[in-house]
Amino acid sequence: GAGNTTKLANQIIVACNIQAVAEAFTLAQKAGVDPEVVYRAIRGGLAGSTVMDAKGPMMIAGNDKPGFKIDLHIKDLNNALDCAHAVGAPVPMTASVQEILQWLHNNDCAAMTTAPSPSITSV
């Protein structure tokens, strides 16, 4: 129903946003720019988000204490992909993020939160 579809839509946005934030900070770090400086510069603009404010400082600090586990995101994204396929909705970004999370699961990172530090996303 509408409630379940709304939850799936929320999980798509959250998971994709977390991945985008992690990739942005990885880019900054690999380019020699302090991710904290990048975070402060962009958080008030259009790229800023509740997810960035909640997860960005954790990523920058390398805090990977368990929170919402990767396995739960995988379950939610699998459900979202099933729903999308059933109704014919293209969700390529969701599929890509699900594959990344599945890789983390398969490589013994399943206990991590979905707020990996930039060094994790560069694997």
Q: For each predicted feature, which ranges?
A:
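Active-site-proximal catalytic alpha-helix in oxidoreductases
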Residues: 1-31, 42-54, 72-75
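Beta-strand segments within the central parallel beta-sheet cores of soluble alpha/beta enzyme folds
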Residues: 34-43, 95-99
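Interdomain hinge/lid region at the active-site interface
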Residues: 4, 13, 48-109
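NAD(P)-dependent dehydrogenase/reductase Rossmann-like domain
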Residues: 104-123
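Short amphipathic alpha-helical surface patches that mediate protein-protein
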Residues: 2, 43-44, 98-102, 119-122
